[in-house]
């Protein structure tokens, strides 16, 4: 029987009822203490036609992460600078995260990396914005090793200095493709296990792109996680790897809110740390995502592949949030497989449920804010934004 608490469900075969309730209880106790990071990052991999639904076209995808961050910080308001990109179906998951953020009284720290534009809003600078996005992974040289190491060290420093549990979310167009590339670089066959923001994941296209990148990367024996990120990864992975490891060195809990992109960071960390410390490292790490993503693909199987490879006990938590009652097509589209996750929607909604808010309250607030977004013209009505 699938374990659940307040509708929150467990995924991953190594989970058991005792561990599940221990994890949920630990999260519930920490809700008011988290430091929330939204890492927005750029990779030219997102410019491949058909690779991502995070924007209707390649031009839109260049600003998707900035628009997501702006909305998460401020919600719907008339003085917005970035229009949320037009989507054929659904709406940005930043809407869910914003609503839940307000409900649980959280505040986010935005970390822009490789965005090519300095945000006007408050943010944490970890490198010069002129560094630009990572190259397309088909080059086999996404970023130079020095940049990867620098981002890793910045994350590590911030993580080690933290005195509170941390929550990591992301907005990285093209990020599920770089996540898959990282996993395949370490020998995992995951092509049929990786989801997508698209209703039908472009598996054949991703396979072609990743094969080309790994062939050109020509990773030699004894390569490490930083080599893999340098070859086929993205800036989010480099920084978040350091942030995760640093926070665990500081004995803090870490919530990784997302799907395959967060599991890629877990894999990178397990490949990087000392083999004798892996279970202790993973004990206070949480993978939190939406129920839509778990339903859409074999995320539990993907998690199991990683835990079996490294002989650790890691479980995932899936949010019970649903839009079955919504009168808005943009929201009900989630129920048929569009968008699914992003910007920490799964983890943020789990925290809202744990704080006592109901599905109806979250849905109602999402609908109110969606109407405001439309009234204020915050969603582009054009296919070219």
Swiss-Prot record:
<protein>
    <recommendedName>
        <fullName>UPF0284 protein PMM0439</fullName>
    </recommendedName>
</protein>
<dbReference type="InterPro" id="IPR002805">
    <property type="entry name" value="Nict_dMeBzImd_PRibTrfase_arc"/>
</dbReference>
<comment type="similarity">
    <text>Belongs to the UPF0284 family.</text>
</comment>
<dbReference type="InterPro" id="IPR003200">
    <property type="entry name" value="Nict_dMeBzImd_PRibTrfase"/>
</dbReference>
<dbReference type="GO" id="GO:0008939">
    <property type="term" value="F:nicotinate-nucleotide-dimethylbenzimidazole phosphoribosyltransferase activity"/>
</dbReference>
<dbReference type="InterPro" id="IPR036087">
    <property type="entry name" value="Nict_dMeBzImd_PRibTrfase_sf"/>
</dbReference>
<dbReference type="Pfam" id="PF02277">
    <property type="entry name" value="DBI_PRT"/>
</dbReference>
